[in-house]
């Protein structure tokens, strides 16, 4: 349904990474704040995702859905937005990563993302930086380890990242930055 709504609204099908980002971005959080090992990103809220698509259709210049790409000459993109300082800020980045090298080890802890894109939000002061959720390395799998909360930091292992500020406490202009370190294995990496 979401794919059809997007196609009807914009005349083309959304990329898989965009659908994934919309569903994660609008999911109702369950359990620990942010992603966790028990509930993932939460419960899909299709209406909230559809509302974003419709709001973007009504005002495509507002930064609700941003599709861009990292290239060999454009390794960083930025989007600025004005915020009220009261309501939460949530930014979600997702991309379809090229196939990595096959892994032979079961439950490998080695990052296997090919194009490691990074998301961060910089506050109005230009110095305060907010980083995405990262799942803690839990070592031995146990019930206690599986209930660990996500933290924030540089995410080196996932092709989806989310920055969430529950109470920004500061109104003004924020900047969302998507960047990539390392070489591209393709001409571009859309997100």
Q: Which residue ranges define each predicted feature?
A:
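Hydrophobic alpha-helical scaffolding
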Residues: 9-13, 36-39, 109, 153
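Acidic glycine-/aspartate-rich tracts in secreted/extracellular proteins
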Residues: 27-31, 96-98, 125-127, 182-183
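Secreted peptidase-domain scaffold signal
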Residues: 38-115, 123, 186-191
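Generic recognition of stable, solvent-exposed alpha-helical segments in well-folded globular domains
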Residues: 14-22, 41-44, 112-114, 158
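Hydrolase catalytic cores
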Residues: 1-33
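Noncatalytic accessory or regulatory domains flanking protease catalytic cores in secreted, cell-surface
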Residues: 35, 118-191
């Amino acid at each position: 349904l979401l794919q059809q709504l997007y196609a009807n609204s914009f005349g083309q099908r959304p990329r898989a990474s965009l659908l994934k980002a919309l569903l994660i971005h609008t999911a109702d959080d369950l359990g620990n704040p942010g992603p966790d090992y028990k509930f993932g990103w939460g419960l899909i809220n299709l209406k909230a995702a559809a509302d974003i698509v419709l709001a973007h259709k009504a005002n495509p210049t507002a930064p609700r859905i941003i599709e861009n790409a990292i290239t060999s000459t454009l390794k960083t993109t930025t989007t600025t937005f004005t915020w009220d300082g009261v309501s939460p800020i949530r930014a979600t980045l997702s991309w379809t990563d090229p196939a990595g090298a096959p892994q032979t080890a079961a439950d490998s802890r080695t990052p296997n993302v090919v194009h490691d894109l990074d998301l961060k939000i910089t506050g109005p002061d230009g110095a305060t930086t907010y980083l995405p959720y990262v799942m803690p390395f839990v070592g031995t799998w146990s019930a206690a380890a599986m209930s660990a909360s996500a933290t924030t930091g540089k995410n080196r292992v996932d092709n989806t990242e989310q920055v969430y500020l529950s109470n920004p406490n500061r109104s003004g202009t924020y900047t969302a930055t998507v960047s990539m370190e390392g070489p591209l294995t393709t001409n571009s990496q859309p997100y």
